[in-house]
Regions:
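Hydrophobic helix-coil surface modules that form long, contiguous segments used
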Residues: 3-11, 16-161
Length: 161
């Protein structure tokens, strides 16, 4: 697994930026990864296309994963991960813009059931936060589609940022 941890000021090691908490920006990520891997980000996946990269002697196939534009945030909050992930999924009980919000907990492939406890609470927390805010929209963005959790790191989609 490859993942980012930009706190307190390491975003500048990954991409050119003003890496100060008071300076904020929105981000768009495209990442090229082996076809059998999964890429995760703070924002929902926009599209996946085959890569033109040659497979080399190993014959690997590659893909390009593009993610939606993020909300305005500090650089240290932006994060992504690439790995051999599996997930468990549920939906919120509450409806947002007429639909239930899918919630996913990602784990190392084969360990999905170990994410079940987190999943059972994640959708409840999303609904609770929306009740506290007295809104029919999930926090921040009604287009957000899932909460993602990976080992030792939490990646919050824009619905939880």
């Amino acid at each position: 697994m490859l993942s980012t941890q930009f706190q307190p000021c390491d975003a500048r090691r990954a991409f050119p930026c003003f890496d100060e908490p008071a300076l904020k920006a929105s981000f768009e990520l495209s990442i090229e990864i082996p076809d059998d891997q999964t890429a995760l980000c703070n924002t929902p996946e926009k599209e996946t296309t085959p890569s033109s990269r040659p497979g080399g002697s190993a014959g690997w196939k590659w893909k390009v994963v593009q993610f939606e534009k993020s909300l305005v945030m500090s650089t240290y909050l932006y994060t992504w991960a690439v790995g051999d992930f599996g997930y468990v999924e549920a939906e919120t009980e509450r409806r947002y813009s007429g639909r239930r919000l899918p919630v996913r907990v990602y784990t190392t492939k084969g360990l999905e059931e170990q994410g079940r406890y987190a999943l059972e609470h994640a959708w409840k927390i999303i609904d609770l936060l929306s009740e506290v805010r007295t809104s029919s929209q999930p926090p921040q963005d009604h287009d957000a589609d899932h909460l993602q959790a990976v080992p030792n790191r939490m990646l919050f989609s824009s619905c939880c940022t």
